[in-house]
């Protein structure tokens, strides 16, 4: 079930969430397979913490890994990824369902590579949801800043 705070944001912006079986989309790869799109069209959301205690949510294509140097430039300081418990405490979402909607006190950084596609799919608050949107809509809805900080996954 989609969290009420996310549902309100989506409805206010004319977006509709996709809902699947519980636990069916916990990774970008599984979400892509379930939705029927390339992994690069899944907008994964990762939470980071700066030394000063501020938080940054990075939203990037599901097939990308982050360039730490570019991330540091975008955030203005070195960041450390938060663990599952801290992520849930700060965002209200568990890993697999983390999304940039209805998150307070967190700077949102959106990878410009998401703009390679007309439609991308971030989670909608649980690991069984997604929402079809665009980079432009994500920036408008979340107030996020568009930056370039990812690189192709070489694994």
Kindly give the residue locations of the regions a language model identified:
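Extended, low-hydrophobicity, polar/charged segments
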Residues: 1-155
């Amino acid at each position: 079930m989609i969290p009420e705070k996310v549902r309100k944001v989506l409805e206010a912006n004319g977006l509709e969430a996709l809902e699947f079986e519980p636990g069916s989309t916990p990774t970008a790869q599984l979400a892509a397979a379930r939705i029927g799109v390339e992994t690069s069209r899944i907008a994964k959301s990762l939470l980071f913490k700066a030394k000063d205690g501020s938080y940054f949510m990075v939203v990037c294509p599901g097939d990308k890994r982050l360039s730490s140097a570019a991330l540091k430039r975008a955030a203005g300081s070195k960041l450390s990824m938060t663990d599952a418990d801290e992520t849930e405490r700060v965002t209200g979402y568990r890993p697999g369902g983390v999304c940039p909607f209805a998150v307070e006190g967190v700077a949102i950084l959106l990878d410009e590579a998401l703009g390679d596609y007309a439609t991308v799919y971030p989670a909608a608050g649980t690991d069984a949801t997604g929402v079809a949107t665009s980079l432009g809509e994500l920036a408008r809805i979340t107030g996020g800043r568009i930056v370039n900080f990812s690189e192709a996954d070489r694994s």
